[in-house]
Amino acid sequence: MIDFLKGRLVSVYPEAVVVEVGGIGYRVQVPPSLAASLPEPGETVFLYTYLSVKETALEMFGFSSELDRTAFLLLLGVAGIGPRTALAVVGRLGTRRLWAAILREDTGILTTVPGIGVKSARRIMVELRDRLEKQQVAVSAELPASDGVPVLAGRAENEALAALISLGYTPREAREALNRLPDRKLDAAGLVHAALRIMGSQ
Amino acid sequence: MIDFLKGRLVSVYPEAVVVEVGGIGYRVQVPPSLAASLPEPGETVFLYTYLSVKETALEMFGFSSELDRTAFLLLLGVAGIGPRTALAVVGRLGTRRLWAAILREDTGILTTVPGIGVKSARRIMVELRDRLEKQQVAVSAELPASDGVPVLAGRAENEALAALISLGYTPREAREALNRLPDRKLDAAGLVHAALRIMGSQ
Amino acid sequence: MIDFLKGRLVSVYPEAVVVEVGGIGYRVQVPPSLAASLPEPGETVFLYTYLSVKETALEMFGFSSELDRTAFLLLLGVAGIGPRTALAVVGRLGTRRLWAAILREDTGILTTVPGIGVKSARRIMVELRDRLEKQQVAVSAELPASDGVPVLAGRAENEALAALISLGYTPREAREALNRLPDRKLDAAGLVHAALRIMGSQ
Amino acid sequence: MIDFLKGRLVSVYPEAVVVEVGGIGYRVQVPPSLAASLPEPGETVFLYTYLSVKETALEMFGFSSELDRTAFLLLLGVAGIGPRTALAVVGRLGTRRLWAAILREDTGILTTVPGIGVKSARRIMVELRDRLEKQQVAVSAELPASDGVPVLAGRAENEALAALISLGYTPREAREALNRLPDRKLDAAGLVHAALRIMGSQ
């Protein structure tokens, strides 16, 4: 329900920040990497947010990009992965390296994140690869209405573009990655994997 | 609890929009038809809303008119119909065609909406017709206090006017529809049906 | 959690109003008598509120005075009385006549409210009388810190004053009612009953 | 989720205050000692807050310092201690005397708080001492990123500094207390205990 907060940064803690919006201070759980990258308290900040609703708690989680938030939400969909663990994965690995690891089926790198054992790493691997495929099928049915992305290129490229956007990449990031592919004679899945590999290595 | 949002349109997705109100971005689920009809991001928009509260989620659904929201709420009252399916019905058919279909007992048109099979279509048909009748009985007991609608015309017309208003039509829409009826020697139910048919064919 | 709303009155329905505060429209359930007493849409209104939290709904109830809200909250504490019924009692009888009825043990008047049968009326009678007594015991232990009410008069009068304030009367209303009592040689309970009778007959 | 409220003080009750922020009045449960210490209604106030979420209630609790709120949250973690009892402990004893009592294992002073019997006092004692130790272990792993505290002094002092800050003391309070210790040749736990004793006696 709450998509973002834009307000005055008031306090920075190791794993949370407080942002004031209109006289109300919102405590937002963030990865330590994001907390360390924020400006000095007093400056205006913009955080993409996810509102976690439980029977006995309302908690807000914050991200610097839609890309990170989308990865967080996909991780939340994996059985046994709660918001804090999902936040740790996004915070420690960063989304680009996460997708690159998923493509390489590199469970090892996932287990470097506190709270992720071999079993959870495998489950993340299986479910996120599956979602990656599904993401393309769902997306190809409804090409994005936003940002007037030109639907001129071939069907596979457009599907790949839509899939990358629905993973949280901006249209510009997605288009640039696709344009840098040496071989574009691939199906949508192949284009997405190749683009993710390129962005994962940046 | 939250009846509407008035703020800056920030992002448009295929099935959701983000509206900023006072530094907070609210993500609102909307039918694709509404998403496509909104102005450019940056403009001010007004959405009638419904706040769905569940044990693990707070979700906001948005509408361009009280008419659509009222239909959505009545659909929500039908067993087995959740917010997303109700939104799909309102988005795909539009409220006028929905009421016209209910009057014609046309379950076929309901099944064109993804997520609605024959069984759900029949249940919607039965329950919404029943509600339509009840709507009139309840409404006739308490004529609307809003908009100073002149209670001069006959009792049946006033009941029909109140029923149409409680279905979400504005007083002006309801009065115009009743005034265009060739035969006004009907009881309240008859007047309502005839008016809905006229508005359903527009 | 939400004690009041102060904003622009946008819409008035038979049993609810919509108040805009900072770009958000809040739908507030109110008694018809309050809806009918509000100014024209567009004016600024102030409503004391109660936020009802349930597993599948957040609903706001509105009152024109703390007195009405306090009575509503005490009614909510009676087994089997939900917010809508409590609102109907406060709306139909008004708090002063409610307390006068409780003192006279007049269950008949309670049954004139839709949704209140003889059994519920008796339960309301018993529980509110009991609360009335408890209210005084609790209150007498902690005299109000607000409004600098002079604690010069006798102990019984101060206890009665505190009890009336905790029932939602303003300090001025409570003091005036006590000052109009012909016989003030009563204990706190007697003073409260007598004052309620006077205010109930206004 | 809601870290603080900054707004106009509207009403003061024995155990709650109402603060207006942007047209909405928020009712905040506070200890009587805090209610009595607030300025006149109409002035701007700042309260650190805790939003308690239950299936049938959203309640806000308020504090004048992070120190008090941190103690409140640690008390909430003790089995059988709810928000009102935790608020009563913080309100009656004050956080400094609470920590001093925990260090002295003085359960007697805890039982002076309404709602705290010998059994709860013992449980608070055991669990808060345990948390105190844990607090240091957890904290020493992630030295605070806030307020650029110079990490020049010895490792034990920095761990003690971080532990005191995570208990809610400001960096300045923590550093001053450590600087006043006659004997600083202690491990982190010893430094923390000594500092708490000094601050507890102020």
From Swiss-Prot, chains A, B, C, D:
* SUPFAM superfamilies linked to this entry: DNA helicase RuvA subunit, C-terminal domain (SSF46929), Nucleic acid-binding proteins (SSF50249), RuvA domain 2-like (SSF47781)
Q: Name one GO molecular function term.
A: ATP binding
- Which InterPro entries is this protein grouped with? DNA_helicase_Holl-junc_RuvA_I, Hlx-hairpin-Hlx_DNA-bd_motif, NA-bd_OB-fold, RuvA, RuvA_2-like, RuvA_C, RuvA_C_sf
What is one cellular component GO term in this UniProt entry?
A: Holliday junction helicase complex
**This protein's record includes keyword DNA repair:** yes
What domain notes does the record hold?
Has three domains with a flexible linker between the domains II and III and assumes an 'L' shape. Domain III is highly mobile and contacts RuvB.
Oligomeric form and interacting partners? Homotetramer. Forms an RuvA(8)-RuvB(12)-Holliday junction (HJ) complex. HJ DNA is sandwiched between 2 RuvA tetramers; dsDNA enters through RuvA and exits via RuvB. An RuvB hexamer assembles on each DNA strand where it exits the tetramer. Each RuvB hexamer is contacted by two RuvA subunits (via domain III) on 2 adjacent RuvB subunits; this complex drives branch migration. In the full resolvosome a probable DNA-RuvA(4)-RuvB(12)-RuvC(2) complex forms which resolves the HJ.
Similarity-based family: Belongs to the RuvA family.
Q: Any idea what this protein is called? A: Holliday junction branch migration complex subunit RuvA
**Taxonomic source organism:** Desulforudis audaxviator (strain MP104C)
Lineage of this protein's species? Bacteria, Bacillati, Bacillota, Clostridia, Thermoanaerobacterales
